Amino acid sequence: MSGLRCPAARAPACLVVAVALCGAGGLTAQQPVTREQVVAAALAHGPRVALAAPDTSAARAGLITARELQNPTVSASYSKDVPQYHASVELPLDLPWLRSARIRVAAEARSSARLRFAFERAGARFDAEQAYTAALAEAAHARLSRRNALDADSLLRMAVLRRDAGDASELDVQLSTVNAGQLANQAAGDSADAVSALLEVQRVMGLAADRPAIALADTLETPGADAAVPAGVPLRVAAAEASARSADAALALAHRSVFASPSLTLGIDSHDPTGAEPGLLPTFGLALTFPLLNFNGGAIAAAAAQRDLARAELDVARRESEAAVAQARRDLAVATAKAVRDRALVASADRVAAMSLAAYAEGAVALPSVLEAQRQAREALGHLIDDLAAASAAASAVRLFSDTETTP
């Protein structure tokens, strides 16, 4: 490659480029992965989903606990008074209005946890898409920087040839040397950034992130224009609604728990040494809790505070969800329009750069004009890469904040 046959003055810069390119490409075979494969791996093995999954298990366990009946208590005793042997069974009575309220609290909490987990899965998909898009953008910038470094090397050799032929000055050679060195350093930095972005994709997938093991199979494309918001309640809002319903049910349970559940006691007495009371003597009892010393005020106040908090969080979730969707849709529209204009600008800037280089080879224009034309071409293509990445990120954000429970 011509970009690696450098003059002695530029040997250190070219060595940096060569090392960076080896790091970016990798010395071992890398498995190509598509965007969908990265998303699937993130959902199956990613850290975000793994951290969110236990919450749903805990909520399901809470619902199982709420539905369970209390175990009876068996007791046995001995007394000197007749009858001397006593045995009893205490059976807690789960009142229907307390049981139903308790189960409703746990059921709504489980619904909220399930919806939050669905939102976390959507967030994991969003993170994977964002990481993949960022890696594509960094890889495109690295390729652009490498091409720019090679073009700058060619321009330097052209300036040296024209100087040796008497058609250019030493100033042109020095300007070309500075330009080539700067672009070589930029290529090295962009190559390192591309490797870092690729390792971030591996981390999101749940893979080791110490060395590149994958390659990007997709390319940066303009997202489709059909980013319609699906019908239904967004996942984040639905989870907040379930939390609010659970808090309402918890407050109702606290009010109903002023009278705690009673318990029924059944037992027998036996063994009268005098023989006055032969056989077994049945006993029966009913234990009731009367609110004489407290009316469950602390629990009621705490439940009321949690209800107010849940309602406030629901209001915030609704407002933030609406704002996030609107902002993401605006960002998508702006980035898509900019990408369309960038394509036309890139074509024009490339033509200007090619024409200026040809004119310099013929001695028709000065070297600074060529450098400026190439700089504008680099910036135009760099803006196109950034705007395509921004459009893809905005499309992912629209999907994240508008996903509903029925979204596939």
Question: What kind of feature is each model-predicted range?
Answer:
Residues E120-A122, N185-A209, A347-T404:
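Short segments within alpha-helical structural elements
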Residues E36-H45, V105, D172-V173, T177-N179, ...:
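Amphipathic alpha-helical coiled-coil scaffold segments and their short linker/junction regions
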Residues P12-A24:
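Bacterial N-terminal signal peptides
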Residues Y78-V82, L93, I268-D272, F290-L292, ...:
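Transmembrane beta-strands of outer-membrane beta-barrel pores
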Residues L69-K80, R99, A260-H271:
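Transmembrane beta-strand segments that form the barrel wall of outer-membrane beta-barrel proteins
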Residues R121-V233, A238, A328-D331, A335, ...:
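Periplasmic alpha-helical coiled-coil/stalk elements that build and connect Gram-negative outer-membrane
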Residues A40-A50, S57-P72, A87-V105, R114-A122, ...:
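A glycine-/polar-enriched beta->alpha junction
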Residues D81-Y85, P278-P282:
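Residues that define the transmembrane beta-barrel architecture of outer-membrane proteins
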